[in-house]
Protein backbone atom coordinates (compact mmCIF):
# COMPACT_ATOMS: atom_id res chain seq x y z
CA UNK A 1 0.00 0.00 0.00
CA UNK A 2 1.18 3.52 -0.82
CA UNK A 3 0.51 6.32 1.67
CA UNK A 4 1.13 10.00 0.99
CA UNK A 5 2.40 11.84 4.06
CA UNK A 6 2.88 15.55 4.64
CA UNK A 7 4.90 15.21 7.83
CA UNK A 8 4.81 18.84 8.87
CA UNK A 9 6.08 20.22 12.14
CA UNK A 10 2.65 20.70 13.75
CA UNK A 11 0.54 17.96 12.15
CA UNK A 12 0.99 14.79 10.13
CA UNK A 13 -1.38 14.72 7.14
CA UNK A 14 -2.08 11.38 5.45
CA UNK A 15 -3.84 10.37 2.24
CA UNK A 16 -4.34 6.89 0.82
CA UNK A 17 -6.64 4.87 -1.41
CA UNK A 18 -8.98 2.38 0.24
CA UNK A 19 -11.44 0.41 -1.90
CA UNK A 20 -11.13 3.04 -4.61
CA UNK A 21 -11.88 5.96 -2.27
CA UNK A 22 -9.41 8.62 -1.13
CA UNK A 23 -9.07 8.62 2.65
CA UNK A 24 -7.41 11.39 4.64
CA UNK A 25 -6.35 11.91 8.24
CA UNK A 26 -4.74 14.69 10.27
CA UNK A 27 -2.74 13.73 13.35
CA UNK A 28 -1.31 16.47 15.63
CA UNK A 29 2.26 16.37 16.89
CA UNK A 30 2.36 16.35 20.69
CA UNK A 31 4.80 13.79 22.08
CA UNK A 32 6.49 13.77 25.45
CA UNK A 33 9.80 11.93 25.97
CA UNK A 34 8.39 9.25 28.28
CA UNK A 35 5.67 6.63 28.31
CA UNK A 36 2.14 7.21 29.62
CA UNK A 37 -0.32 4.82 31.23
CA UNK A 38 -4.09 4.48 31.22
CA UNK A 39 -6.43 3.38 34.00
CA UNK A 40 -8.90 2.08 31.42
CA UNK A 41 -8.29 -1.43 30.17
CA UNK A 42 -9.76 -0.69 26.74
CA UNK A 43 -7.79 2.54 26.21
CA UNK A 44 -4.20 1.55 25.57
CA UNK A 45 -1.75 4.47 25.80
CA UNK A 46 0.04 5.52 22.61
CA UNK A 47 3.55 4.54 23.67
CA UNK A 48 6.44 4.22 21.24
CA UNK A 49 10.12 3.34 21.35
CA UNK A 50 12.83 4.10 18.81
CA UNK A 51 16.50 3.26 19.28
CA UNK A 52 15.95 2.92 23.03
CA UNK A 53 14.21 6.31 23.37
CA UNK A 54 10.63 6.31 24.66
CA UNK A 55 7.83 8.67 23.57
CA UNK A 56 4.09 8.89 24.08
CA UNK A 57 1.36 10.94 22.45
CA UNK A 58 -0.03 13.44 24.95
CA UNK A 59 -2.01 16.40 23.58
CA UNK A 60 -2.07 18.13 26.99
CA UNK A 61 1.59 17.89 27.96
CA UNK A 62 3.32 21.26 28.18
CA UNK A 63 6.59 19.32 28.06
CA UNK A 64 5.97 17.88 24.61
CA UNK A 65 9.05 17.75 22.39
CA UNK A 66 9.44 20.89 20.30
CA UNK A 67 8.86 20.05 16.63
CA UNK A 68 8.66 23.55 15.15
CA UNK A 69 12.24 23.64 13.92
CA UNK A 70 14.02 22.31 10.86
CA UNK A 71 15.93 19.57 12.67
CA UNK A 72 12.58 17.92 13.46
CA UNK A 73 12.63 16.61 9.89
CA UNK A 74 15.44 14.19 10.77
CA UNK A 75 14.56 13.46 14.39
CA UNK A 76 13.31 10.53 16.46
CA UNK A 77 10.00 12.26 17.12
CA UNK A 78 9.40 12.72 13.38
CA UNK A 79 9.51 8.95 12.88
CA UNK A 80 7.32 8.40 15.95
CA UNK A 81 4.79 10.98 14.73
CA UNK A 82 4.52 9.21 11.37
CA UNK A 83 4.03 5.83 13.07
CA UNK A 84 1.41 7.32 15.41
CA UNK A 85 -0.50 8.80 12.47
CA UNK A 86 -0.43 5.46 10.67
CA UNK A 87 -1.82 3.80 13.79
CA UNK A 88 -4.81 6.19 13.68
CA UNK A 89 -5.83 5.22 10.13
CA UNK A 90 -7.70 2.08 11.15
CA UNK A 91 -5.62 0.10 8.68
CA UNK A 92 -4.07 -3.19 9.70
CA UNK A 93 -0.36 -2.77 10.49
CA UNK A 94 1.53 -3.80 7.37
CA UNK A 95 4.51 -2.91 5.18
CA UNK A 96 3.82 0.40 3.39
CA UNK A 97 5.47 2.59 0.78
CA UNK A 98 5.39 6.25 1.78
CA UNK A 99 5.92 9.62 0.14
CA UNK A 100 7.04 12.31 2.61
CA UNK A 101 8.10 15.94 2.33
CA UNK A 102 10.92 18.34 3.15
CA UNK A 103 10.82 22.14 3.33
CA UNK A 104 12.18 23.69 0.13
CA UNK A 105 15.16 25.07 2.08
CA UNK A 106 16.10 21.48 2.93
CA UNK A 107 15.08 19.87 -0.37
CA UNK A 108 17.15 22.21 -2.58
CA UNK A 109 20.77 23.30 -2.29
CA UNK A 110 22.24 26.76 -2.89
CA UNK A 111 22.13 26.14 -6.66
CA UNK A 112 18.43 25.17 -6.65
CA UNK A 113 19.29 21.53 -7.26
CA UNK A 114 18.08 18.55 -5.27
CA UNK A 115 20.03 18.29 -2.03
CA UNK A 116 20.76 14.59 -2.33
CA UNK A 117 22.40 14.44 1.09
CA UNK A 118 19.34 15.83 2.87
CA UNK A 119 16.95 13.69 0.83
CA UNK A 120 18.89 10.54 1.64
CA UNK A 121 19.10 11.57 5.29
CA UNK A 122 15.33 11.98 5.35
CA UNK A 123 14.77 8.58 3.75
CA UNK A 124 17.04 6.80 6.23
CA UNK A 125 15.36 8.52 9.16
CA UNK A 126 11.81 7.61 8.12
CA UNK A 127 12.75 3.97 7.53
CA UNK A 128 13.94 3.45 11.11
CA UNK A 129 12.05 0.86 13.13
CA UNK A 130 9.55 2.01 15.75
CA UNK A 131 8.16 -0.30 18.41
CA UNK A 132 4.55 0.24 19.46
CA UNK A 133 3.56 -0.91 22.94
CA UNK A 134 0.89 -3.57 22.84
CA UNK A 135 0.38 -3.82 19.08
CA UNK A 136 2.08 -4.33 15.75
CA UNK A 137 3.88 -1.47 14.04
CA UNK A 138 3.70 -0.39 10.43
CA UNK A 139 6.91 -1.18 8.56
CA UNK A 140 8.15 1.46 6.13
CA UNK A 141 9.19 -0.52 3.06
CA UNK A 142 10.27 2.39 0.84
CA UNK A 143 10.43 6.18 1.04
CA UNK A 144 10.17 8.87 -1.63
CA UNK A 145 10.69 12.55 -0.78
CA UNK A 146 9.00 15.58 -2.37
CA UNK A 147 9.45 19.32 -1.67
CA UNK A 148 6.78 21.04 0.36
CA UNK A 149 4.27 23.30 -1.43
CA UNK A 150 4.85 22.06 -5.00
CA UNK A 151 2.73 18.85 -4.82
CA UNK A 152 -0.29 20.93 -3.78
CA UNK A 153 -0.48 22.35 -7.30
CA UNK A 154 -0.32 19.15 -9.35
CA UNK A 155 -4.00 19.02 -10.30
CA UNK A 156 -4.19 22.75 -11.13
CA UNK A 157 -0.98 22.71 -13.16
CA UNK A 158 -2.26 19.84 -15.28
CA UNK A 159 -5.07 22.03 -16.61
CA UNK A 160 -3.06 25.18 -17.38
CA UNK A 161 -2.15 26.37 -20.87
CA UNK A 162 1.48 26.12 -21.96
CA UNK A 163 2.15 29.83 -21.39
CA UNK A 164 0.60 29.86 -17.90
CA UNK A 165 2.13 29.21 -14.50
CA UNK A 166 1.12 28.85 -10.88
CA UNK A 167 2.40 30.56 -7.73
CA UNK A 168 2.10 28.18 -4.78
CA UNK A 169 2.40 29.62 -1.26
CA UNK A 170 2.59 27.19 1.66
CA UNK A 171 2.52 28.79 5.10
CA UNK A 172 3.25 25.85 7.36
CA UNK A 173 3.87 25.42 11.04
CA UNK A 174 7.55 26.32 10.83
CA UNK A 175 8.43 27.45 7.30
CA UNK A 176 7.03 29.58 4.49
CA UNK A 177 7.57 27.85 1.13
CA UNK A 178 6.87 29.64 -2.16
CA UNK A 179 7.18 28.10 -5.63
CA UNK A 180 6.59 29.53 -9.10
CA UNK A 181 5.85 26.49 -11.27
CA UNK A 182 5.32 26.29 -15.02
CA UNK A 183 2.32 24.63 -16.63
CA UNK A 184 2.04 20.84 -16.47
CA UNK A 185 5.09 20.68 -14.18
CA UNK A 186 7.40 21.37 -17.13
CA UNK A 187 9.72 23.35 -14.88
CA UNK A 188 10.14 25.45 -11.76
CA UNK A 189 10.88 29.10 -12.42
CA UNK A 190 11.65 30.18 -8.87
CA UNK A 191 11.50 28.91 -5.30
CA UNK A 192 11.88 30.73 -2.02
CA UNK A 193 11.72 29.62 1.59
CA UNK A 194 11.88 31.41 4.91
CA UNK A 195 12.64 28.75 7.55
CA UNK A 196 11.67 31.10 10.38
CA UNK A 197 8.12 32.10 9.38
CA UNK A 198 5.25 29.79 10.30
CA UNK A 199 1.99 29.72 12.21
CA UNK A 200 3.88 28.33 15.21
CA UNK A 201 4.95 31.92 15.89
CA UNK A 202 1.35 32.63 16.90
CA UNK A 203 1.09 29.39 18.86
CA UNK A 204 4.26 30.22 20.79
CA UNK A 205 2.93 33.68 21.56
CA UNK A 206 -0.29 32.25 23.00
CA UNK A 207 1.68 29.79 25.15
CA UNK A 208 3.86 32.60 26.49
CA UNK A 209 0.87 34.80 27.32
CA UNK A 210 -0.91 31.93 29.07
CA UNK A 211 2.20 31.26 31.15
CA UNK A 212 2.72 34.92 32.09
CA UNK A 213 -0.83 36.21 32.56
CA UNK A 214 -2.78 33.07 33.47
CA UNK A 215 0.03 31.26 35.29
CA UNK A 216 -0.84 28.23 33.17
CA UNK A 217 1.47 26.15 31.00
CA UNK A 218 -0.29 24.68 27.98
CA UNK A 219 0.77 22.43 25.15
CA UNK A 220 1.03 23.61 21.55
CA UNK A 221 -2.02 21.47 20.79
CA UNK A 222 -4.04 23.33 23.45
CA UNK A 223 -2.75 26.70 22.22
CA UNK A 224 -3.89 25.84 18.69
CA UNK A 225 -7.35 25.01 20.02
CA UNK A 226 -7.48 28.34 21.86
CA UNK A 227 -6.59 30.16 18.64
Model-predicted regions and their roles:
Residues 1-168, 185-200, 221-222, 227:
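Nucleotide/phosphate-binding catalytic cleft detector across ATP-hydrolyzing
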Residues 10, 174-175:
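Gly/Ser/Thr-rich beta-alpha loop segments that engage phosphate groups in nucleotides
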Residues 169-173:
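Active-site-proximal alpha-helical scaffolds that flank and shape metal-associated catalytic sites
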Residues 177-179:
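A structural feature that tracks compact, well-ordered secondary-structure segments
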Residues 182:
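A cytosolic small-molecule/anion-sensing beta-strand core signal
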Residues 203-205:
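RNase H-like, metal-dependent nuclease domains and their acidic two-metal-ion catalytic environment used
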Residues 208-227:
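A mobile "lid/hinge" subdomain adjacent to the ATP/sugar-phosphate binding pocket shared
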